[in-house]
Amino acid sequence: KGEDDVIIICEDEHVFTENYQRDKFLDQVMRCAQFGTQILFGGIGGFGKAVPIESELFWIDWNWCTQFMVIYQSAFDKILNTRFTKKDVVDEYLGKIIPNKVVIHPFISIQKEFGYSDITKGNERVGQIGKYFDDADLRLKTYEHIVKKYDIML
């Protein structure tokens, strides 16, 4: 319980994409704080529903498969008071208990594949994790296309 406004969690399989730009990312972190965001994800492998809230930012209802996240102070107590079990997949669990989640798209972070020791059963096939990110990317591109096609103001 310090004075941190945010904590960035970056797992060992994280790699920045060509979309990462330091100053732009910092602006997005600040902008999301104004929205009351509790977790900002740099990339995700799956999600339920998504709503564009601003250029390159989507609110999501739940998510899984992430390796880079910014956790805002407003989520600290909720996380610290949650009882995790050994079976919980932390990023997926956080996606369920924290309501105000946003993902940056195009993704600024993806998972590199290197032979995980902690991989979830079923995801051990080479290329599987990358496919999840590609599928999530395609879904978000579809939302972006609709916003542009119908000139929806964000």
Task: Report each predicted region and the residues it spans.
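An acidic/histidine-cluster motif and surrounding catalytic segment
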Residues: 1-10, 14-154
